[in-house]
From Swiss-Prot:
The chain crosses the membrane at residues 6-26, 350-370, 424-444, 458-478, 499-519. It holds the Pfam family 60KD_IMP. It comes from Salmonella enteritidis PT4 (strain P125109). Keywords: Cell inner membrane, Cell membrane, Chaperone, Membrane, Protein transport, Transmembrane, Transmembrane helix, Transport. The gene is yidC. Residues 29-42 have a biased composition (Low complexity). The keyword Amino-acid biosynthesis does not apply. One of its GO terms (cellular component) is plasma membrane. It is found in: Cell inner membrane. Residues 28-56 are annotated as: Disordered. This is Membrane protein insertase YidC. Belongs to the OXA1/ALB3/YidC family. Type 1 subfamily. Interacts with the Sec translocase complex via SecD. Specifically interacts with transmembrane segments of nascent integral membrane proteins during membrane integration.
Amino acid sequence: MDSQRNLLVIALLFVSFMIWQAWEQDKNPQPQTQQTTQTTTTAAGSAADQGVPASGQGKMITVKTDVLDLTINTRGGDVEQALLPAYPKELGSNEPFQLLETTPQFIYQAQSGLTGRDGPDNPANGPRPLYNVEKDAFVLADGQNELQVPMTYTDAAGNTFTKTFVFKRGDYAVNVNYSVQNAGEKPLEVSTFGQLKQSVNLPPHRDTGSSNFALHTFRGAAYSTPDEKYEKYKFDTIADNENLNVSSKGGWVAMLQQYFATAWIPRNDGTNNFYTANLGNGIVAIGYKAQPVLVQPGQTGAMTSTLWVGPEIQDKMAAVAPHLDLTVDYGWLWFISQPLFKLLKWIHSFVGNWGFSIIIITFIVRGIMYPLTKAQYTSMAKMRMLQPKIQAMRERLGDDKQRQSQEMMALYKAEKVNPLGGCFPLIIQMPIFLALYYMLMGSIELRHAPFALWIHDLSAQDPYYILPILMGVTMFFIQKMSPTTVTDPMQQKIMTFMPVIFTVFFLWFPSGLVLYYIVSNLVTIIQQQLIYRGLEKRGLHSREKKKS
């Protein structure tokens, strides 16, 4: 087997993966875009079974910090809109990215409150509480590190419930503190809850679309418990009423999409119930309900939870809750993507440019792979040296395929040649290639990250297709510089068009990934020449001009 046949192996692996990816998407199709109708009712057998309320109408207040711009409904105190000023919606735009939204076309909210027997958010106790607030707009002032937004509600019995949002400068984690003052003569039983609800279908302004060959990051729900560090839960599964019902101490529930996430983290020592629910009207939910707390007459009870609403910044998320950083979707190759990202981030701390960091990490990866690359070319050279003997054996044995196979294996053993030695290094490199793809598509740090010249976003395709063309050129040179024993006309035609085929594939790939492949090909050319010189000294390679 020679290096050109190895390109066929790469193509087979690559196309096979793309077919598998397409099959996964067909098996779990995304529903067609449709209009979502806001509703104040809850589907039977869903969140109502948890004593969790539906949405309601109230006054909207705004809260602005240096990193968050939220809209909170005083009816229940739900976060109904979240803008992220530090992250533009599109490259070059002044419009901030919108994470949470409440419109006729799309619903994505972070709900929270107090349920339980005496909780004001329990549907059995009437409409959700209409909180009183001091003002309609809260702003984190310059020089201020913390902003508190207190909301109070007093029920007919004179019990006072206070819900306070606590924001900190530069932080996407929002603490929600509850205070329950029991003015009656009987204990009050309340439970905190946190629920994330979202329309399954994406409206046009949120559906960014995808290229024909792009891999897709996960959009859906997830949860974590001490026993199950990270489990995904598809929206389609919830919509089919195959719902989650797990009890756990600690953990969190979340909704994920590319680069961004929302999560509720209960802060208590008791047991929490994690659930999902189909709310009807194309809306699904994931949430938690905490173990009930008793507040004695004349006493004040305190409870708290934390809402994460923002980008998937791994180190910050890990500091908020165990395993919350796992929400960064690196796919099934996360065990390779994670260390690659940590290495890339460490390099970036020195060079300050993600593009140059990718170039450096390419040299590191190819340096580590060099022994395998050398073994690959050595194996291919030995296979070429055996071709005359193999051809003579085939002529001698004619159509006796069984004897041909037996004698060929004996020849490989005698000459100490592994017929698969040329493929193995390539098979190892494919997971690294795909892991880098997932890393580029899942790491918020690389979103809108510029490199140089016309490349302003390493996570997006090259707008002028220059990098894919350069990649095809480097692939062409590698092919022309590689000795070949391919004699089959069909294989020769395939090999001729292989650089063109790969160039077409790479047109829609992230420019950071194409940059990696270009540099990798250039390193391959250099390593190839160094290895060939060593093989020449051993009589395993000749600089004869390659036959066309």
